[in-house]
Amino acid sequence: MRFGLNIDHIVTLREVRKTYEPEILEALFIAKNTHKVDLITIHLREDRRHIQNEDVLRLLEISPLPINIECSINAAITDFLCSLKNKPSKVTIVPENRNEVTTEGGLDCSLKGLEEVIRAYHNKGIEVSLFIDPLKDALHFAREHQVKQVEFHTGVYANLHNALYSNANNQIHAISALKDKSPKELKEELHNAFLQLRRMSKEAFFMGITACAGHGLNYTNVKELLKIPSLRELNIGHSVVSKAVLVGLEKAILEMAQLIKR
């Protein structure tokens, strides 16, 4: 299983104070020196709430690890990434809503302009991945447009697992739609969400598409996904950075790697 470390929220801490620390390149080399991280993931959002254009340039220039850039189909971002001298190892196209706290679901594959953006990256020799819900129609869209990799949105699975097996439902930011569900309901919905991820990962494999997954994964809910042999990569960020605040980035990375690289 490949471990993609998302370092967005290291930069979030920097941007809160509009200062120079924490240094994104220091985080990059801490990750690299663990010898457990396979790629670095960043999300270049339209509102630049964390990662900035300059971060992209610096990372691509110096990174010894592959860089996966998440972004919307925004024309300015597409033009910027296509113009780069140092190319990312892949671009993962994600849905984006400026009012969202974090990505809320998979990509709408009927989105106007999506096909043109995929073509633009392919024309520059940049691999494209699509951040999608685990649905067969989305996989067929990927195959039809020569997209060789997808990342399944695991938010539904992760939220259900957290509600059932942690104290998430008793926290200040508990998800209201899950608070009133019984443990039996949560368990059934979680099982169905897991089965859907497993089915679609297998479907992707038979289509010749590499299946990755990410969103909301943490040190508890990630373990079950290791039972899906067709999954090849997990992208994890917030939970690792959250733990790093308490125990340090190196230790946080190593603890996650110990779980997913068994």
Curated annotation (Swiss-Prot):
It is found in: Cytoplasm. Homooctamer; tetramer of dimers. Pathway: Cofactor biosynthesis; pyridoxine 5'-phosphate biosynthesis; pyridoxine 5'-phosphate from D-erythrose 4-phosphate: step 5/5. The active site is at 43 (proton acceptor), 70 (proton acceptor), 215 (proton donor). The record marks 151 as: Transition state stabilizer. It comes from the Bacteria. The gene is pdxJ. Belongs to the PNP synthase family. Keywords: Cytoplasm, Pyridoxine biosynthesis, Transferase. It catalyses: 3-amino-2-oxopropyl phosphate + 1-deoxy-D-xylulose 5-phosphate = pyridoxine 5'-phosphate + phosphate + 2 H2O + H(+). InterPro entries: Aldolase_TIM, PyrdxlP_synth_PdxJ, Pyridoxine-5'_phos_synth. Pfam families: PdxJ. Its EC number is 2.6.99.2. 3-amino-2-oxopropyl phosphate binds at residues 6, 17, 216, 237-238. GO terms for molecular function: pyridoxine 5'-phosphate synthase activity. It comes from Helicobacter pylori (strain G27). Its main location: cytoplasm. Catalyzes the complicated ring closure reaction between the two acyclic compounds 1-deoxy-D-xylulose-5-phosphate (DXP) and 3-amino-2-oxopropyl phosphate (1-amino-acetone-3-phosphate or AAP) to form pyridoxine 5'-phosphate (PNP) and inorganic phosphate. GO terms for biological process: pyridoxine biosynthetic process. The lineage of its organism: Bacteria, Pseudomonadati, Campylobacterota, Epsilonproteobacteria, Campylobacterales. GO terms for cellular component: cytosol. This is Pyridoxine 5'-phosphate synthase. 1-deoxy-D-xylulose 5-phosphate binds at residues 8-9, 45, 50, 102.
